[in-house]
């Protein structure tokens, strides 16, 4: 089993990228290959998961360890295979995905590619309470608590995500507050003031 591969991205197609490591080109199936277009002919570290089938050995690649954990959670659901899991991750709506699972919003879940009503219900059954989004809006973390260093700030950012604020906005706000100490409530009040300006 591989944790990650480090090498040069040599090719990007609609379904995969090629990562060359020690003279070997690995085909890595990724959620959004074009997200790597700025890294062609540059070194990259891609987290991987290997799937072995009778007819093929496939490698799936991820931008972060958290994205890989989300993928593994998704493929643990009956009815979701690796291709469907990548399609869900490619939608780049991890906060919406988690919220829909927690609120049992089947209609929302069926908007993801290749997810029907039965599969959406199975997702809720299997993943409810097990998948949370990191407070900075980066790819979802699976069953991970807020970091101990500033749990109040993490809780505030999660609450703001739940209110519908964009992860990109919150990432900037979180950086502004890093190194400070306050309550989650005060962080939210300050963040709202910053967003209204």
Curated annotation (Swiss-Prot):
Assigned GO CC terms: cytoplasm; Holliday junction helicase complex; Holliday junction resolvase complex
Keyword presence, Glycoprotein: no
Pfam families: HHH_5, RuvA_C, RuvA_N
Transmembrane segments: none
SMART domains: HhH1
Subunit and partners: Homotetramer. Forms an RuvA(8)-RuvB(12)-Holliday junction (HJ) complex. HJ DNA is sandwiched between 2 RuvA tetramers; dsDNA enters through RuvA and exits via RuvB. An RuvB hexamer assembles on each DNA strand where it exits the tetramer. Each RuvB hexamer is contacted by two RuvA subunits (via domain III) on 2 adjacent RuvB subunits; this complex drives branch migration. In the full resolvosome a probable DNA-RuvA(4)-RuvB(12)-RuvC(2) complex forms which resolves the HJ.
Protein name, per record: Holliday junction branch migration complex subunit RuvA
Source organism per UniProt: Streptococcus pneumoniae (strain ATCC BAA-255 / R6)
Organism phylogeny: Bacteria, Bacillati, Bacillota, Bacilli, Lactobacillales
């Amino acid at each position: 089993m591989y944790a990650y591969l480090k090498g040069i991205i040599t090719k990007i197609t609609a379904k995969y990228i090629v990562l060359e490591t020690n003279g070997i080109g690995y085909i890595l199936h990724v959620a959004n290959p074009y997200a790597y277009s700025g890294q062609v002919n540059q070194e990259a570290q891609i987290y991987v998961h290997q799937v072995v089938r009778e007819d093929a050995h496939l490698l799936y690649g991820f931008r972060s360890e958290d994205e890989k954990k989300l993928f593994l959670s998704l493929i643990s659901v009956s009815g979701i295979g690796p291709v469907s899991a990548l399609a869900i991750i490619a939608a780049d709506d991890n906060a919406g995905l988690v919220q829909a699972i927690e609120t049992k919003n089947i209609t929302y879940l069926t908007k993801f590619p290749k997810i029907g009503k039965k599969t959406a219900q199975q997702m809720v059954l299997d993943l409810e309470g097990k998948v949370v989004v990191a407070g900075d809006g980066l790819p979802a973390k699976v069953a991970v608590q807020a970091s101990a260093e500033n749990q109040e700030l993490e809780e505030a950012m999660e609450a703001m995500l739940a209110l519908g604020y964009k992860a990109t906005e919150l990432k900037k706000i979180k950086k502004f507050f890093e190194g400070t100490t306050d309550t989650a409530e005060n962080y939210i009040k300050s963040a709202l003031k910053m967003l209204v300006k």
